[in-house]
Swiss-Prot record:
Its EC number is 4.3.99.3. One of its GO terms (biological process) is queuosine biosynthetic process. It catalyses: 6-carboxy-5,6,7,8-tetrahydropterin + H(+) = 7-carboxy-7-deazaguanine + NH4(+). This is 7-carboxy-7-deazaguanine synthase. Mg(2+) binds at residue 40. Residues 18-182 form the Radical SAM core domain.
Amino acid sequence: MMRKINEIFYSLQGEGYHTGTPAVFIRFSGCNLKCSFCDTQHEAGTLMTDDEIIAEVSKYPAVTVILTGGEPSLWIDDALIDRLHEAGKYVCIETNGTRPLPESIDWVTCSPKQGVKLGITRMDEVKVVYEGQDISIYELLPAEHFFLQPCSCNNTALTVDCVMRHPKWRLSLQTHKLIDIR
C-alpha cells in the first residue's frame, strides 16, 4: 500500500504526556476535518511504501514513533503498525478520533473536536485545543490523562484558569515552539 506522507522528521515531542521524549514523527497528508486553528499543510506529500517509511524511520535513534497529520487514520493499517513494531518501535498516534484505528497502536492521543462524533473507544490521553469551550463533555471520555492546550498565546491565561478550576486536566504547551525546534 502506498501512503501519502507530508514529512518524516526527528525531534522531541512537544505536547501532552510524552513531552520531551525523542521521537520520529511521521506526518501524514490529508484530513477529514477543517479546523480553523490547524497549522499543518495537509495536502502536500509524497507517496511512500512501507519499506521506504521504515528505512526513513530507521535513520534515527528514537524508539518512539509518532503518527500525526493531517489525520493519520486515513492512511494507516495493521500492516504498517506491525512493520514499525518489528523495527522495535513504540507507536503513538495523534488523531481526531473520528475513524477506527488498528488495535496494536501502543499509545492513542485523541484530540476530539466539539460536535464531531468519535469513531474510537480506546484512548490513553485526551488533548483539547482550548478556545474557551465547555470541557465537561470531554471528561466522560475513557482516557487516563487529560490535557488542555491553548489555541494561541492570546488565550494561555484562559487555559491556565480552566485547568486550575478543573484539576482532572493538565496544561500542555507546545514546548517545541517555545524552545524553537521542530
